[in-house]
């Protein structure tokens, strides 16, 4: 084998190893703005004011993640969010908190409306909460966790 081929194989191997190492690292932040950006893939819109946030993405290629977000928004923004994501008010009340440890700041009371994507699916734990009086919202969204 020529030296050129050996060098090429070494470079490809090195790039492959580097790719595997980088793609196997989790993403984790307790910064609300970064959490929003990792989750949404976009900048924070002017209509919302971030208060707290946490985001964790597993190192797996399947893109498993968990988001906790507290923010304030106007009613119009949240209504559009509910419609776009096809959320409905949770009337069943599944134990969506039972499989996760919520951050200490993730606290709602009975004034919050709780929305879900599919409340009949006992394994669908993502919830979207809004206090219509204060405009405070919480998002707990999980995929594959």
Tell me what each language-model feature is:
Residues 83-145:
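Extracytoplasmic electrostatic interaction patches
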Residues 24-80:
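N-terminal export/targeting and maturation segments
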Residues 2, 40, 78, 97-100, ...:
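Short linear interaction motif-like sites in intrinsically disordered regions of transcription factors
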Residues 21, 38, 58-61, 114, ...:
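Intrinsically disordered, low-complexity segments
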Residues 1-22:
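Sec-dependent bacterial lipoprotein signal peptides
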Residues 14, 43-44, 107:
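A generic structural signal for short, non-catalytic loop/turn and secondary-structure boundary residues
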Residues 3-4, 24, 43, 117:
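Compositionally biased regions
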